[in-house]
Every structure is written in C-alpha cells, then in structure tokens.
C-alpha cells in the first residue's frame, strides 16, 4: 500500500477492465516517471474523449457527431444489419473488411447473473430500425459465450416472425471468447460461413 494520491491513482487504474493490481501499480509508476507534458497530454485526451465522444443515435456505435461514420456512409448496404454487443466488436469486424452493411450495438448481452435482461439492452431501438421493412438480413454477431448465445437466441426468436433472414456467425470463433480478441482471418471466415438460425 502506498500513501495518499499514489494509492488513489493505483486504485482508479485498477478499476479499468483488464487492469489488475500489479498492472495498475506499473502504470501509476510509469505516469509518475513521465514528463509533465506527457501526463498533461494523457489527461487532456481522457477529458476530450469524455467531452466529445457519444453514442450514435442510429446504431449505438461510438461517434463524434449525431451519427457514426458507418451510418453516414452511403456506400454501406442498409438492408443488412450486423448486431454486436459492444462498439469494440464493430472495430473487430471492420478490420476484416468482409462486411459492407450497417451495425446495431446492443450495449451488452443478456446475463441474468449480472442482472442484465433484454430491457437493459438496445433491443427496442433495433426493433424500431426493422419496422420499416427495408432490412432483409440480420446477422447476429454476439460473442460465442453463454451470454452471447442467449442473446442471439432471444433475438432470433423475437425477429424470426417478421420474415427476415436471421443468421449467426459461423464457428471458428472460440466458445467462451470475445470478438475483440479474434484475429482478422478467423473473424473473416466466421463471417463467410455464417448460418441461418433455426429456432
């Protein structure tokens, strides 16, 4: 344990996802040893991202304007929507350069253990996007873990009666893994081999 502000910094860094106590301590001491100008740049970047970045009004992806770049891109196919859990999944899929449709970010996955139900996700917004009938295919690209599968099944059962083609990314993604950690080739193959969900 350190005193005062040093321990406060370590504690705050430790609250970040994927940063354990040892990593938090290493980062804190890196910051302490950094030049003041570098620390100011980091602090400024943190403040700016909180002030300028929001979530796209259409799809829920990160954006600096009302709509994200993908929703504003007229070259994207608006008839195909890929449903993902988080904005980081959009980045992972975009790296493959395989998908030319639009996205819908749910903001998580159904997880009763964590107290996250369907009403906590952006499902109502998805249904509103599907209401005009212009979407012909919905690709469910939730994580291949228990929560992601539960979310995909829930959505498929809800949307299937609308007559849309509902597909799920193919295997190749490790069960229990997260999309953001998949390499481009694996994720690209999973996209190519997506399958129809029969519920």
UniProtKB/Swiss-Prot annotation:
Domain annotation Toprim: ranges: 79-174
An annotated GO BP: double-strand break repair
Residue spans, zinc finger C4-type: 56-71
Molecular-function GO terms, alphabetical: DNA binding; zinc ion binding
Keyword annotations of the record: DNA damage, DNA recombination, DNA repair, Metal-binding, Zinc, Zinc-finger
The protein's role, per its UniProt record: May play a role in DNA repair. It seems to be involved in an RecBC-independent recombinational process of DNA repair. It may act with RecF and RecO.
PANTHER family (UniProt xref): RECOMBINATION PROTEIN RECR
Assigned protein family: Belongs to the RecR family.
Listed name of the protein: Recombination protein RecR
Origin species: Streptomyces coelicolor (strain ATCC BAA-471 / A3(2) / M145)
Gene assigned in the entry: recR
